[in-house]
Swiss-Prot record:
Annotated protein name in UniProt: Taste receptor type 2 member 1
Predominant cellular place of this UniProt entry's protein: membrane
Species whose genome carries this gene: Pan troglodytes (Chimpanzee)
Function according to Swiss-Prot or TrEMBL: Receptor that may play a role in the perception of bitterness and is gustducin-linked. May play a role in sensing the chemical composition of the gastrointestinal content. The activity of this receptor may stimulate alpha gustducin, mediate PLC-beta-2 activation and lead to the gating of TRPM5.
Alphabetized UniProt keyword annotations: G-protein coupled receptor, Glycoprotein, Membrane, Receptor, Sensory transduction, Taste, Transducer, Transmembrane, Transmembrane helix
Gene name tied to this protein: TAS2R1
Disulfide bonds: none
Pfam family, one: TAS2R
Length: 299
């Protein structure tokens, strides 16, 4: 018999899972229909579609972890499962990083020659960013598969083992290298891009307030809404990365509140940010409304 707090937690996990599948599914379906109609896809739509697909698989795994934790189902640790998990996790991280870089290049106003060069070519670089991410993540998975005998299972045992074990020095060294290669690099790129974008939008907002003080100008709130959207992206992305670091470096007893809280917060990112993307994109927002209205009419 499940305890009451576990039932509430599982209901929240189900809602989170359904929201993540719906929001990311909307992004994939809408951009897929546009691709069929026009036989081409805009760079941003391509990046969003790839990100949404990776988040769907990530959401599936997070829900699988929730089912394991709640119902004490045995987790089968094999190289294939570990490779799929690592591939989806790292690919989603890099695609989200490139989305932040894309927004920065398109919206931010910086006069540095390198930034101007990036601003003019960012659209053409998107397919290469995606391809480069696939190759890089594949290399990371090959590295993990080489040390899967003592590294990846140790990472997963942090979730589901009750007895703590002392890390070996070689395992710790590899985990440090893995952290730098997998988390630090994309996180640093993302922080630089998004903070630069936030400062640029903040400066633009202050300039608008000074020039049009006391007057009502159409679209005056657009920079503020964009700034709030980017800030929410930053908070979700950063908290997601930090919790992954905690879960991979510390041991938690299953069903403890802190462990359940961390897993729930991890699931908020792929569903919550996709919802923000839909609300901030007129095309996606309109199609999401049409889908909801059609669903109500069919009932």
């Amino acid at each position: 018999m499940l305890e009451s707090h576990l039932i509430i937690y599982f209901l929240l996990a189900v809602i989170q899972f359904l929201l993540g599948i719906f929001t990311n599914g909307i992004i994939v379906v809408v951009n897929g229909i546009d691709l069929i109609k026009h036989r081409k896809m805009a760079p941003l739509d391509l990046l969003l579609s790839c990100l949404a697909v990776s988040r769907i698989f990530l959401q599936l795994f997070i829900f699988y972890v929730n089912v394991i934790v709640i119902f004490f189902i045995e987790f089968i640790m094999c190289s294939a499962n570990c490779a799929i998990l690592l591939f989806v996790n790292e690919l989603e991280l890099w695609l989200a990083t490139w989305l932040g870089v894309f927004y920065c290049a398109k919206v931010a106003s910086v006069r540095h020659p390198l930034f101007i060069w990036l601003k003019m070519r960012i659209s053409k670089l998107v397919p290469w960013m995606i391809l480069g991410s696939l190759l890089y993540v594949s290399m990371i998975c090959v590295f993990h598969s080489k040390y899967a005998g003592f590294m990846v299972p140790h990472f997963l045992r942090n979730f589901f083992s009750q007895n703590a074990t002392i890390q070996k020095e070689d395992t710790l060294a590899i985990q440090i290298f893995s952290f730098v290669a997998e988390f630090s690099v994309p996180l640093l790129i993302f922080l630089v891009a998004v903070l630069l974008l936030i400062f640029s939008l903040g400066r633009h907002t202050r300039q608008m307030r000074n020039t049009v003080a006391g007057s009502r100008v159409p679209g005056r709130g657009a920079p503020i809404s964009a700034l709030l959207s980017i800030l929410s992206f930053l908070i979700l992305y950063f908290s997601h990365c930090m919790i992954k670091v905690f879960l991979s470096s510390l041991k938690f007893h299953v069903r403890r509140f802190i462990f359940l809280f961390f897993i729930l917060v991890i699931g908020i990112y792929p569903s919550g940010h996709s919802l923000i993307l839909i609300l901030g994109n007129p095309k996606l927002k309109q199609n999401a409304k049409k889908f909801l209205l059609h669903s109500k009419c069919c009932q």
